[in-house]
Amino acid sequence: GREKDLIIISGRNIWPQDLENLAEQQPEIRTGDASAFSVTGPEGQERAVMMVQCRQSDEQKRAGLRERLHGLVSEEFGIDCLIELVPRNTLPRTTSGKLSRSGARKEYLKRIKAEQATELNESLYTSAFRQQAI
């Protein structure tokens, strides 16, 4: 399973645990609170994503943490990594209690598809409403 967890971006091989360890060095993040994986973007390129369980509710502090993590990953690994903050106890785990990167990836993709569907529905509704107004 470890080989398929490997993140390959622009020919660079990055182990997800290296990204996760970098995040876990931050005072707000506990060991086991980060899960890194890659997804294929709309143009077919790989994109690194890190889901991080965050106990912070203050939006300014959350934004600061997101920016700090993004900067650290960029500085350390030279890649653009999307940082997704999620509520605590929401990262999927295996039956033995370990983080499930594939489970986190599936949840992320499911949420993105749901958001895109919502945006599409709102867009269709808005354009239909405009047509009626004309």
Per-segment meaning from a language model:
Residues 33, 37-38, 49-50, 70-132:
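Conserved C-terminal "lid"/linker of ANL adenylate-forming enzymes
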